[in-house]
Amino acid sequence: MHEITARFATPAEIQEWDTHVIANPDGGNLLQSASFAKVKADYGWKPRYIVYEGTVDRGGERQSFASYSLAFEKNIPLLGKLWYFIKGPAVHDADELPALLQANRRLITEQKLGVFAVKIEPEIVADEHAQQVIAGTELVRTADIQPNDYTAILSTEGTEEEVLKSLSSRGRNAVRRATREGCEVKRVELTDENMRAMYALMDTVGQGKVSLLLRPYEYYRDFWRAFENAGQGRLYFTYEDGKPSVGAYVINYGTKGTYKDGGSKPRRKQYGDSHLVQWTAITDLMKEHGISTYDFCGTPPAAELKNKEHPYYGLGLFKTSFTKNVTDFVGVYDQPISELKYKLWNAGVERLMLRLWVKKHHYSFY
């Protein structure tokens, strides 16, 4: 039997937030980090620092449980507060979810927090057992939000040569050819010029095909700077005719590396340049931070990889040239706290808010 309680973190715990998050059952996620909390706080979401603790049954033994998870809070007119755990809360597996949901409800009701619904997005692999556990809870499946609910994850444990050999032949050959032909990848400073060049690349190639709605430049600027200032983010370019032609912003968080943002100009001359950008970032993070995995952050679901009509088909082709290991997570679920208010939210208030938000701000509500 799992026994889990929820409380707000102390000021001392918030001060060391990243240390706690990286020790979470899932190894931590950059979208649960202190840096991300600062960014979202400037764009209309209040970070709420939640600590789950208790005891759980694992392998027939009672073990202590602790999970430090960010809930982002938004006030919804007439309904109250919505909580969104972006890529959280952190758990070992789906079996811990029912106790965690009970902890949410107790915290919210006992402290009269006015939260009518909690949106969760835990990194639990979507296997049959997880789906069965979730089906037995109060959770309501909703639309996916983050791009890496389906994603390609490369294992980076081993030597550089061993990891290179683990790539598919297409990815490996692209890296080697670009290297052989003198393609140069540079890690660059986060100057305004470089960040604007990166933003332009993100807004150039294939974005219409993958239905991305870019946030304003200022959001990415603040995001990139926040993670760089924490020693967790870096920007890479390759150049063509003296101008950036491929860009990637990557993040190290705990033992995880993540390809967070990328862009490139179309019809480039150098074969394999985008592969070499990724390979350079991966090997740098291996050497400097000892990462054990690298998340390419977004593909079609595993069953849809060969579907040419899928909006992420092209991205999937590129990313699976590094690893065929595509992971499907369970996705996004709502936990209704107030049944009446949630029915109103689900019946049309959410869709209306999202539509009005995008019309006014020209970027995603979440």
Model-derived regions, located:
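A cross-family glycoside hydrolase active-site/sugar-binding cleft signature
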Residues: 86, 119-121, 260, 297
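The substrate-binding groove and active-site-proximal loops of carbohydrate-active enzymes
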Residues: 87-92, 269
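N-terminal cap/recognition module
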Residues: 77, 81-86
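Short, high-confidence coil segments that cap the C-terminus of an alpha-helix
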Residues: 45-47, 112-115, 290-291
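Aromatic (often tryptophan-rich) hydrophobic motifs at membrane interfaces
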Residues: 99-107, 221-343
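A conserved beta-strand-loop-helix scaffold within acyl/acetyltransferase catalytic domains
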Residues: 4-58, 67-78, 122-127, 134-149, ...
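A gly/proline- and charged-residue-enriched helix-loop-helix capping module
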Residues: 90-133
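Active-site/acyl-donor-binding loops of N-acyltransferases
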Residues: 3, 10-14, 24, 39, ...
